[in-house]
Amino acid sequence: MAEVESFTLDHTKVKAPYVRLIEEQKGPKGGTIANYDLRLAQPNQTSIETGGLHTLEHLFASLMRDRLDGIIDISPFGCRTGFHMISWYTYDTETVAKALKETLTEIRDSIEFSDIPGVSEKTCGNFKDHSLWSAKNWAKVILDEGISSDPFERKVV
């Protein structure tokens, strides 16, 4: 089996919430993408319930793109502790952490249900599984803890 970076990361050593550059990959025709770990919850201690995670996913898809160019995708981890963010550009982790902080602040302070993109049966594959209350609560928890630009040493932005 292929070695997968996230399965080699020592999840007992990281200190969430944080942003981590997992890797840069060069494509066979020359393009480069960057893969980030946006870890919101401490692994093996807590996880984000699916409704809140789903709502954060929809909001991040739009709000993070408002702040950072070149985002290809933002997708939740199966363990429900954070997200992969794939970008055409390699940003330093402090820049990504600041964008994430601004995004979570907007979610906590001003987002209403009508602001969430893609929450109808026509535009979402599981449209009934959203929770703005949970997304706002997690935004508050994450912001209160502070987002670090380093996964192992707290460097809060």
UniProtKB/Swiss-Prot annotation:
Its cofactor is Fe cation. It is an enzyme of class 4 (lyase). It comes from the Bacteria. It comes from Oenococcus oeni (strain ATCC BAA-331 / PSU-1). One of its GO terms (molecular function) is S-ribosylhomocysteine lyase activity. It catalyses: S-(5-deoxy-D-ribos-5-yl)-L-homocysteine = (S)-4,5-dihydroxypentane-2,3-dione + L-homocysteine. This is S-ribosylhomocysteine lyase. One of its GO terms (biological process) is quorum sensing. Belongs to the LuxS family. The keyword NADP does not apply. InterPro entries: LuxS_sf, Metalloenz_LuxS/M16, S-ribosylhomocysteinase. Involved in the synthesis of autoinducer 2 (AI-2) which is secreted by bacteria and is used to communicate both the cell density and the metabolic potential of the environment. The regulation of gene expression in response to changes in cell density is called quorum sensing. Catalyzes the transformation of S-ribosylhomocysteine (RHC) to homocysteine (HC) and 4,5-dihydroxy-2,3-pentadione (DPD). It holds the Pfam family LuxS. Its EC number is 4.4.1.21. Gene3D superfamilies: S-ribosylhomocysteinase (LuxS). Binds 1 Fe cation per subunit. Keywords: Autoinducer synthesis, Iron, Lyase, Metal-binding, Quorum sensing. Fe cation binds at residues 54, 58, 124. Homodimer.
